[in-house]
Amino acid sequence: MKLSRISAINWNKISDDKDLEVWNRLTSNFWLPEKVPLSNDIPAWQTLSVVEQQLTMLVFTGLTLLDTLQNVIGAPSLLPDALTPHEEAVLSNISFMEAVHARSYSSIFSTLCQTKDVDAAYAWSEENAPLQRKAQIIQQHYRGDDPLKKKIASVFLESFLFYSGFWLPMYFSSRGKLTNTADLIRLIIRDEAVHGYYIGYKYQKNMEKISQAQREELKSFAFDLLLELYDNELQYTDELYAETPWADDVKAFLCYNANKALMNLGYEPLFPAEMAEVNPAILAALSPNADENHDFFSGSGSSYVMGKAVETEDEDWNF
C-alpha cells in the first residue's frame, strides 16, 4: 500500500496572516473551568426558585449538546477543506476548546446541582424535539459534501444557536446572581466569538474563488437556513422559558445574534433593529471586560492577566 506524503507544518512560513493572528488569540485566551471558583455561587444557587434552577440545568444541558456536536463533528468536518496547514491547526484548537466548554457545564452541575436533577436534564435533552432538531439540521450539513455550506452551518451554530442559552446566565449576572458561573460563561462566549469570526472569514476567502452565480446561490441558502433555524429556535425558546416572563427578551437576543452571524459571513443583517433590541443590562453583562469575581492570579478570566512571580531578598522584608 502506498502511503501519502505528510508535510510538517511550518509556522515560520505563513500564507494567511489571519491564521497566526487567530491562533495567538485562542492560545492566549486558553482557560480551564477548574480555575473558576464555582462553589462561591452555592449560596446564590440556593436562593433561586425551583423553576429557575430547573431552567438553568436545561439551558446548560442544551448548550452541552451543541458543544459536543461542534467538538466531535463540526470542527473536524471543516478540516479536509482547510486552505492552509495553519488553518488545520486553528480548527484543531477550536475542536479542543469545544470539548473544554462541554466539560465546563459538567463542572457547574457537579458544584451546584443534585445528580438526580442533572440526570433528568440530560434525559430531557435526548427527547426535546426543537433541541434535537437544530442539532440534526446542523449535522446534516456537516455530513454533506459542500465545504462552504459546512462553514455557513458552523457560523450559525457558533454565533447564533448558543445564545438562547447564553441569555440566562447573563440575566442572572446582571442581577448579581451566579456571578462566578457568569464569569465562566463569558469565557465560553469569548471563545465562540473568535470561532464564528474565523470560520466566517474563511468562508469569505473561499467565496472569492467561485462564480457570481454560486455566490448568489450560497447567500440564498444561508438566509433560508437561518430562517429555518430561527423558526425552530423560537419554538425551543417558548418551551424552555415557558414558566418565566423572559421569552420575548430571549427572542430579541436571538435576532441580535442572528444579525451578527450574518455579518461574520459577510452579509447584511436580516432582522430590523426593533426586533433585535437587547436589554442594555444583558449587553453589559456580555462584555468580556466585565469584572470577574475569581482570583486574578488564576489567569483564566478575560479582564486580567496572569500574575508574575518575583524573587524576594532578605532586605525586602525589613519594614
Task: Walk through the language-model features, giving the residues of each.
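Non-heme di-metal
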Residues: 1-319
